[in-house]
């Protein structure tokens, strides 16, 4: 997959989505992925910051961008029911970006992952 992206005639990226571990992010980076997502949304804020910062520092050292998640999106993909979803506080998001230097954020704003009935 990485080789196909590198040989494409148009710009292409290879992205690791929703990794919950530093080790898996590092494996993807070693394989040549252009971007990774570290999903520490299941962790307390401070632990999510520490994990994300560790991934960002390693990834940025080799030119790889990083997405992180803050809050809990409802839906099939994350295994969260609507009742357990947690909307991201904008002040927490700003602080998180400042502390981690992450490139992109997945935030919970009342949206959901996965399938919608009737769509």
Q: At which residue positions do the language-model features occur?
A:
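Alpha/beta enzyme core
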Residues: 1-11, 18-119
